[in-house]
């Protein structure tokens, strides 16, 4: 059964930690009737450690800050030109288990990439989306009281060099790739629009809307 309307907030370039705190507040304060939201954002350069993160996977962070988070997974990198989507969903209301939610997000990303003639796939033992073994999108979620927060990060048109300062997602030597290198020059706004459509489709929402106002 399709859910009603999925709301999107397009936040532009935002520091990581204030968005993290806003996600937590939204999740703690929402009611059973709250509209599900997805926040689309870019972050200045930052490494984030998941709950399973190990210090040895931070090789040489250097001048890039490291933030400990409460999402699943290990260490990853965020930076300008990477499209991040935070999925603030009532998973219980949607009727999805965690594994199904992850699979639906991966399929949305795979179909998005296919629209650029990029053939991608998921791995059963390593959440995310890959192209010829190189990772193009990372996933890390947290479920609290049946509601999800955190989300996905898609490499679109960014500097990939900082990934070499870590073992991405805890895998030594994991190659990273991005859409620009596979499909040529890319407009981030267009990718954002296509991602919205794919998430609405794969998460079984009837429609979408753009939400205005801040996240404070």
Swiss-Prot record:
Gene Ontology process terms (BP): protein modification process
Keyword presence, Acyltransferase: yes
Main subcellular location: cytoplasm
GO cellular component: cytoplasm
This protein's pathway: Protein modification; protein lipoylation via endogenous pathway; protein N(6)-(lipoyl)lysine from octanoyl-[acyl-carrier-protein]: step 1/2
InterPro entries associated with the record: aa-tRNA-synth_II/BPL/LPL, BPL_LPL_catalytic, Octanoyltransferase, Octanoyltransferase_CS
Keywords: Acyltransferase, Cytoplasm, Transferase
NCBIfam families for this protein: lipB (TIGR00214), PRK14342.1 (NF010922)
Matches recorded under PANTHER family: LIPOYLTRANSFERASE 2, MITOCHONDRIAL-RELATED, OCTANOYLTRANSFERASE
Protein name per Swiss-Prot or TrEMBL: Octanoyltransferase
Taxonomic source organism: Pseudomonas putida (strain ATCC 47054 / DSM 6125 / CFBP 8728 / NCIMB 11950 / KT2440)
Top-level taxonomy: Bacteria, Pseudomonadati, Pseudomonadota, Gammaproteobacteria, Pseudomonadales
């Amino acid at each position: 059964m399709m859910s009603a309307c999925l709301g999107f907030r397009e936040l532009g370039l935002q520091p990581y930690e204030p968005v993290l705190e806003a996600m937590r507040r939204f999740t703690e304060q929402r009611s059973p009737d709250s509209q599900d939201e997805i926040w689309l954002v870019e972050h200045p350069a930052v490494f984030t450690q998941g709950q399973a993160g190990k210090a040895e996977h931070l090789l040489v962070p250097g001048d890039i800050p490291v933030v400990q988070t409460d999402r699943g997974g290990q260490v990853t990198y965020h930076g300008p030109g990477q499209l991040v989507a935070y999925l603030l969903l009532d998973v219980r209301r949607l009727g999805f288990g965690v594994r199904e939610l992850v699979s639906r997000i991966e399929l949305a990303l795979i179909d998005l990439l296919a629209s650029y003639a990029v053939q991608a796939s998921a791995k059963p033992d390593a959440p995310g989306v890959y192209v010829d073994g190189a990772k193009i999108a990372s996933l890390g979620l947290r479920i609290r009281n049946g509601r999800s927060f955190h989300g996905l990060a898609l490499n679109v048109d960014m500097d990939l060099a900082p990934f070499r300062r870590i073992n991405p997602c805890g895998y030594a030597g994991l190659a990273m790739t991005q859409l620009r290198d596979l499909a040529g020059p890319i407009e981030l706004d267009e990718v954002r629009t296509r991602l919205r459509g794919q998430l609405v489709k794969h998460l079984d929402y009837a429609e979408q809307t753009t939400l205005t106002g801040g996240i404070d």
